[in-house]
Design a protein with these regions (language model features):
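Hot-dog-fold acyl-thioester-processing enzymes
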Residues: 42-65
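Beta-rich strand-turn-strand
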Residues: 88-113, 117-122
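Non-catalytic linker/capping segments at the edges of enzyme domains
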Residues: 1-37, 42
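Single conserved hydrophobic/aromatic residue that forms the stacking wall/gate
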Residues: 120-131
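A generic structural micro-feature
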Residues: 16, 50, 75-77, 92, ...
Length: 131
């Protein structure tokens, strides 16, 4: 299974624009769930030194799409038509865990959930909290 998913990751890295940026690595798959390690390099940061929100959305879009593509055996390439995001706190340059989960799959529409978290906690939340 890991080898099969890594074929899709390699295709995404070689043919996709954002696939070249995030450098995804496989962590875990089970039906309806995918976990990857990705990286936010320096060119994804905003002037404040945190990951630009659109880059976070792009990584979420990628991991959710890759799950659906894999489960459809590569027969579909989905469009994200209604992507909502909530940014609870900033992310910083470095490795992140990206997860995707299928909530409900219909004939033409899939509801999914994606989450991101950094692999480390530096800088400390105290460094960016406003008092």
């Amino acid at each position: 299974m890991k080898e099969e998913i890594e074929k899709y990751l390699a295709f995404h890295k070689n043919k996709g624009g954002s696939g070249k940026i995030f450098n995804f690595k496989f962590i875990e798959y089970r039906e309806g769930f995918l976990k990857l390690k990705g990286s936010f390099p320096a060119n994804t940061l905003n002037p404040a030194g945190t990951v630009q929100g659109g880059q976070m959305n792009s990584m979420l879009d990628d991991v959710t799409s890759l799950l659906l593509i894999y489960e459809a055996d590569g027969t579909i390439y989905p469009n994200s038509t209604n992507l909502h995001s909530i940014h609870h706190r900033p992310l910083f340059e470095g490795d992140a865990i990206a997860t995707a989960e299928i909530i409900k799959k219909g004939k033409n529409i899939v509801n999914m959930r994606g989450e991101l978290c950094l692999l480390y906690t530096s800088p400390s939340p105290r460094d960016w909290m406003v008092s």
